[in-house]
Amino acid sequence: KGVEIVIHYNKSKAKAEKLKKELSTNDTKVYLVKGDLSIENDVIKIIKFAKSKLQYFDCLINNASLFENDKLENFNTDSWGKHLRTNLRTPALLSKEFAKNIKSKNNNIINIIDQRVFKLTPYFFSYTISKTGLYTLTKTSAMSLAPNIRVNGIAPGPTIKNKRQSE
């Protein structure tokens, strides 16, 4: 039966449109919404948009994140705050609103964490702190929202080769 999906993007409009095209088959409807997850008003706009398009929510995937390299010795409060807002506060806000808009049982929240929360290093300080917070949010949300909502985290290792990695 028909599936409806809301996909958020910030700077990757072309990739979001490509994904929409790939997913828009048969009875699947895909809606795109732009917003900066570090800005609370944008998050509120995304929530309102999703509510306007979907009758109810049954799955939330918190996948977006900010990933910048810093260390305790050189981090700045702007980067620290943006990491916490994007990687921790926004998933908390989205999870709260998700829980208010479910129809029945068997709902899911999936938080994409990072293997770094289990293998700590001094690198990517702000990112790692925000993702360890998301790990804790995942565990406490699972306890709070059960049994109607399952909350799980996925902690992958590197998934995309970047300029700091070799073949």
PLM regions with names:
Residues N108-A146, P158-K161:
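Catalytic loop of short-chain dehydrogenase/reductase
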Residues N63-E68:
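Conserved NAD(P)H cofactor-binding loop of Rossmann-fold oxidoreductase domains
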Residues K71-L72, S79-L84:
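Substrate-binding pocket helix/loop in short-chain dehydrogenase/reductase
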Residues I46, I61, L94-F98, I102, ...:
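Hydrophobic positions on the long internal alpha-helix
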